[in-house]
Amino acid sequence: MDFFYIGVMSGSSLDGIDIALLKQDDRSRLVATHYIPMPEDLHAELLGLCSSGADEFARAAIAEQKWCKLVAQGVQTLLKEQNKVVADIRAIGSHGQTIRHEPARGYSIQIGNPALLAELTEITVVSDFRRRDIAAGGQGAPLVPAFHEALFDDNKDHRAVLNIGGFSNLSLIESDRPVEGFDCGPGNVLLDAWIQSQRHESYDKDGAWAASGKVDPELLKKLLSDPFFLTKGPKSTGREVFNLGWVHHHLFQLPTLAPEDVQATLLELTALTITESLQTAQAVTKELLVCGGGAHNKALMKRLAELLPDTEVNSTEKFGVDPDWVEAMAFAWLAHCCLEGVPANRPTVTGAKGRRVLGAIYPA
């Protein structure tokens, strides 16, 4: 039987909200999309909630109402554009907006007010996907490897799927073993933060600014010494660890560097931590499929290809899947798994004690 779901994803980059309409039968097919750029005031509010401050509960409640109302408007626009009505949609899978992720301390916080979203859209909402895995001893992240496996496993070739959003994570898909996956480290988060602080640009288009600089070996060595990079998976990370303050902490110990050289070094950090993660996992992979915003960073894609000469590096576009929409599709699929009672975490990815059904249901 065919079902339609809507997936909503707002990632750690805080640049916008992705809304995807998914048709789900024996496979997942992207039908349509809608993108909402993050308003500057809401971006600032959400970023402020990623670190400790005054009156956090009230600030979070106000911010999530704004976020939720934006999503509801986006869902209504998408339905109208596709000549769909509320009754056509089985559920919305809403990831929410992560403001803290500290699985070692037993929590991951996503705001988004799924109850209000169900009320405003009159559609059942599935949300809160991470906490059940954490309750079972897992990292609660990454959650997309199971979807990567469903989408890209052809039972023939060994391949890896790399998502480069604010942070980068890998899914290792081999036909003769369970899917594995983990966070590698910063994806775009430091690149975006640095260019925003130095040039007041939202991101480094095509990686052009990074390409204009030179990698500084001393800075790179200091960045790579972070304990996270020495830890084997399962592992996940977030802005609590990698942020602009972390970059400045390491820069403070060095002579002044040209801003473009810092950007080049941050890009090298992203590329190296991805390729070293692949090597540490001893993954036998012929192909690396890249999704997320980082797939559009030409300098980063070029560097990955240079560091992985025996691996074909491609965008997921090769499989007819737009790299910008894989994560939103994944949360639509996770909503489907929840309603069907299908466990969707992977203990080989998160370290949980077992398979669990993920998500909390807010009926329409």
From Swiss-Prot:
Pfam families: AnmK. The keyword Nucleotide-binding applies. ATP binds at residues 11-18. GO terms for biological process: 1,6-anhydro-N-acetyl-beta-muramic acid catabolic process; amino sugar metabolic process; peptidoglycan turnover. Keywords: ATP-binding, Carbohydrate metabolism, Kinase, Nucleotide-binding, Transferase. It catalyses: 1,6-anhydro-N-acetyl-beta-muramate + ATP + H2O = N-acetyl-D-muramate 6-phosphate + ADP + H(+). It comes from the Bacteria. One of its GO terms (molecular function) is ATP binding. Catalyzes the specific phosphorylation of 1,6-anhydro-N-acetylmuramic acid (anhMurNAc) with the simultaneous cleavage of the 1,6-anhydro ring, generating MurNAc-6-P. Is required for the utilization of anhMurNAc either imported from the medium or derived from its own cell wall murein, and thus plays a role in cell wall recycling. NCBIfam families: PRK09585.1-3 (NF007139). Belongs to the anhydro-N-acetylmuramic acid kinase family. This is Anhydro-N-acetylmuramic acid kinase. It comes from Pseudomonas syringae pv. tomato (strain ATCC BAA-871 / DC3000). The gene is anmK.
